[in-house]
């Protein structure tokens, strides 16, 4: 396998199955973060991920971390918390605030650079990127953002300023997404936090099959309208 250099004159990506094994999933370098290129990338299960000072790097890891419908795991302490919490969640009410908060959450080595923020703001403006906000006494205390691909949602990052706020965001969003016909949440790479929530890994080839099957089927009308999300059931 080799690392591919993207042409600035073409939006074409190599086959994601040609990504490197080490580092896992690295596929290509270069190109830009235009809306057009990002749309092409996500249709093929490819996403940008790079640190400040690095060129744009494009990834498609194997295996792929995903959250299947109904598999979000709630610990005993989380269930206890849900019985007495004072949070409420909204959708697409404060995208800019959420992505900036996610960047601050990972400030020691954030990949959410100013260029990434600008690119995903543009994706939000054209209806491809969406945010979930969690509020406590009028203050933004948690949330997440990602990209819709039909009945798949590609989660990008989350943040939490209070205990359980990001978990609450994911729970409220997952149930909303499923009610509107959502099928799968892509979490990209498994880590200890997402694993504790019930995220699992599937082979890249299976993920790409799921992506192909569901990305051109729209969720039900009203899914992405700015709104308050229903209280999660558990």
UniProtKB/Swiss-Prot annotation:
Residues that span the membrane, as ranges: none
Keyword list (alphabetical) reads: Acyltransferase, Cytoplasm, Transferase
Q: Which Gene Ontology cellular component terms are annotated? A: cytoplasm
* Matching Pfam families: Leu_Phe_trans (PF03588)
> GO terms for molecular function, please?
leucyl-tRNA--protein transferase activity
Q: Which GO terms describe its biological process?
A: protein catabolic process
Principal location listed in the UniProt entry:
cytoplasm
* Family recorded in the similarity comment: Belongs to the L/F-transferase family.
Role this protein plays: Functions in the N-end rule pathway of protein degradation where it conjugates Leu, Phe and, less efficiently, Met from aminoacyl-tRNAs to the N-termini of proteins containing an N-terminal arginine or lysine.
> What is this protein called in UniProt?
Leucyl/phenylalanyl-tRNA--protein transferase
What organism is listed for this UniProt entry?
Answer: Pectobacterium atrosepticum (strain SCRI 1043 / ATCC BAA-672)
Q: What is the lineage of its organism?
A: Bacteria, Pseudomonadati, Pseudomonadota, Gammaproteobacteria, Enterobacterales
